[in-house]
Amino acid sequence: MSKQNAPSDLQEHLARLTERGLVTVIGKPINKDTELHPLARWQFQGGLRDEERRAFLFTNVVGAKGEKYDIPVLVGGLAASPEIYAAGLGVPVGDIGKVWVKAMAEPVQPVLVNDGPCQQIVETGDDLKRSGLASLPVPISTPGFDSAPYLTATLCVTKDPDNGIQNMGTYRAALKANDRLGVRMASRLSGAGGYLHWQKYKKLKREMPCAIVVGCAPAVLFTGPQKLAIDVDEMAVAGGLMGAPVRTVRCKTVDLVVPADSEIVIEGLIDTDLLEPEGPFGESHGHVALEDFNMSMRVTAITRKRKPVFLSIVSQVTPSESSVLKKVAYEPMFLEHLRHVLGIRGVTRVVMHEPLTNLRKVIFVQFARGTPRTEVWRGMQGAASLQAQCGKLVIAVSDDIDPENANAIFWSMAYRSDFNTDVLTMPYRSAGHGPKSGRAAEEGTLMIDATLKSVMPPLALPAEEYMRRAHDLWQELDLPRITPQSPWHGYELGDWAPEWTAFAQAAVRGDWRASGENTFARRHGNLKPETPVRGVEKKKD
């Protein structure tokens, strides 16, 4: 694994992305309420490849009523692509999983400092009534459907009143007034750690302190969406991701600590008695979340750097920045669980399907060829049960199938699955993250074994050496740019004989007549056309 060199705050990360040509700066006036997110969304709806996506820095942000903001807005700066995400950890893309596994095993405790850049400017009291949240360039994520501007790239910090352990989660927060937010923390099984804290404060008949961080070191922000175990301090895991302690500072008006190098921190108290209607809002499951009663947060302070950058993420329909944030970390953590917690042999890769299905619903588990069937089924069951919200459909494939290619998955199911014996359903799983309209709270799991269970003839494409030569020839001829799609060459799958290799080699040398002489000598009568040669000649021998 490469040595970690994670940026210490969001602006250092932005500078590094800029140096690598991964930032598009937009100086034209952009309306945060109608234009900003739709423009960034085209990166995901416009057919761009991962490596073509960029972070967008909007430096001339205006509002629907003519407001002008002196704070730039960064969208796509966390995870428009895996490359941008990896830059936030200071490692190559291939090391993302290793960094996460190491951080979970070797967390680094934060250090408390007396003051930090996040408190260079402090707004409290009447200042909040006059401007407060309205002074921030908070975009509307889904214009035409969202009920308000929403904070999306959040770290909502809360603390367990019993043991004092903090939790950081990424939860949406709607602007309600200059000094009030509507906060949604998932109450479902495997939902928000902050919600569990809220339940405890409710029993104590106390308001819940909350600090919402908007922009800080990417490694810290990455912990928010990852659904770490309850009572795991995300700040320590973030230190593991950075390879150094996170500098923290005490909040001004609530008893919480936040990253000292944050861009903006919104402090407040969440009501545990009365809930307020919140939504609609375009959610990461790909549908609009309708109006629900959710938490109401009274803002007690807004602290920030003198020149902060406001951070927002593209969520809603996948692929999105939100799904990349989860995918690049979920997949290695699932693989680590299957291999080293459950001890499953033969598992080589876990891929969570991203387009439209939002990662959580469909999981592909890849196995080495020849893995015992018992291990294949243990692996699928393990993937389906690690998180309550993940694994409605789990499909196992062999290692010649690209699990990122849905067409290859269908091909594997069509030719390698017997739906009498290779399919299993399990009832009573949580419906998880999704639209509520017409859905039951419970649903089932479907598992399909689409691995190679016996030998098969080779894949009917030219052998690799000929396809490689043809690829070079294609480029020499200056034909339209091509991107190889797996499978792009033929390969053996166990059902092949040496004499057929000899025939094929003779054919490409132009010696096909010799093969014809061979087969002429092997003619046979009293047979039906399409009778396999092997069976007849084996009996003859």
For each predicted feature, which ranges?
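Extended, highly charged
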Residues: 1-541
